[in-house]
């Protein structure tokens, strides 16, 4: 892994896990699989490079306060491909 993003779990109970991610340009999460449906709420604008388990690359622009939802099973590495620090909150729905 190039340079790991900082993650801070803010809430973790039987219903949800809420994690704040902070990425400097070029930092990444590392390959991971989402076990639960989840919501991402960007705190800052930014650009992500997502690399899936097959090596396919996709770019996404994030807009501050514009949340999005994904189903469980997504497997990818998330990289800040922008030029500024990127922060988002991920809420995993355990039930």
Indicate residue ranges for each PLM-predicted region.
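Short beta-strand His + acidic residue motifs that chelate non-heme Fe in jelly-roll/DSBH
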Residues: 29-31, 49-50, 75-82
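A short glycine-rich, His/Asp/Glu-containing loop-to-beta-strand
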Residues: 3-30, 37-40, 91
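Ligand-binding loop in jelly-roll beta-barrel domains
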Residues: 73-94
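Short, conserved beta-strand element in jelly-roll/cupin
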Residues: 33-49
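Short acidic-glycine-tyrosine-enriched beta hairpin
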Residues: 55-72
